[in-house]
């Protein structure tokens, strides 16, 4: 049985917004955070160079949250990327907030998905309309989204579909055709661009990547 932490707080009413707030956030945001649970967390090591990512999978009453911090070298320059992805209970992407800090300063990207339409910092990106999943170029976390959503049987293929791919360090959003084939209980073959890129993926009980062939390796995990 999980432990429940009871929080008592004084609610202040903001004079500027008129919205009740607790510790600087709205009541709705406070309630969501108070009832969230970290399902899994871990560390991935980048195998193509210098890089680490700390990751958390969080469950709330209504959403799944994928949250990570990436430290790496981009063009021999230190870079830090942070992201937070909100998905519904069926792992369909709802929104994402991404920030990147490097020698060029800090940049931010806000993505929203609404009924098959994708918005990039408030502007519709028609090139990725119809996509269901977001795909982060610097992280193996988002491979979990189609794996969870599709629930493939062993030997079954997803067929080709388009993901909304976030390129790093450009922080641009573009379509990426891809396909998943379930090879075994915890193993998948991932391919993109019609087979131009192929890699084997090994997952854990939560369908999080433990080994992304040649690119990422999970070095620890907690549940």
Pin down the residues of each PLM region.
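Short loop/turn motifs at secondary-structure junctions and domain boundaries
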Residues: 75-78, 191-195
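Beta-turn initiation residues at beta-strand->coil junctions
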Residues: 70, 97-100, 122-123, 192-193, ...
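C-terminal structured interaction module
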Residues: 193-223
């Amino acid at each position: 049985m999980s432990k429940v932490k009871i929080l008592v707080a004084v609610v202040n009413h903001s004079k500027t917004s008129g919205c009740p707030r607790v510790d600087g956030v709205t009541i709705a945001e406070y309630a969501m955070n108070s009832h969230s649970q970290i399902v899994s967390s871990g560390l991935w090591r980048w195998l193509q160079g210098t890089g680490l990512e700390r990751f958390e999978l969080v469950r709330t009453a209504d959403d799944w949250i994928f949250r990570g911090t990436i430290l790496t070298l981009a063009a021999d320059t230190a870079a830090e990327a942070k992201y937070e992805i909100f998905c519904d209970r069926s792992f369909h992407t709802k929104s994402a907030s991404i920030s990147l800090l490097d020698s060029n300063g800090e940049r931010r990207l806000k993505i929203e998905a609404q009924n098959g339409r994708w918005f990039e910092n408030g502007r519709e990106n028609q090139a990725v309309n119809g996509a269901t999943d977001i795909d982060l170029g610097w992280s193996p976390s988002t491979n979990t989204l189609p794996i969870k959503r599709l629930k493939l049987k062993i030997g079954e293929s997803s067929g080709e579909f388009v993901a909304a791919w976030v390129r790093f360090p450009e922080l641009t959003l573009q379509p990426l055709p891809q396909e998943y084939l379930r090879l075994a209980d915890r193993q998948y073959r991932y391919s993109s661009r019609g087979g131009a890129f192929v890699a084997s993926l090994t997952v854990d009980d939560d369908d999080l990547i433990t080994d992304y062939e040649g690119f990422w390796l999970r070095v620890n995990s907690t549940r």
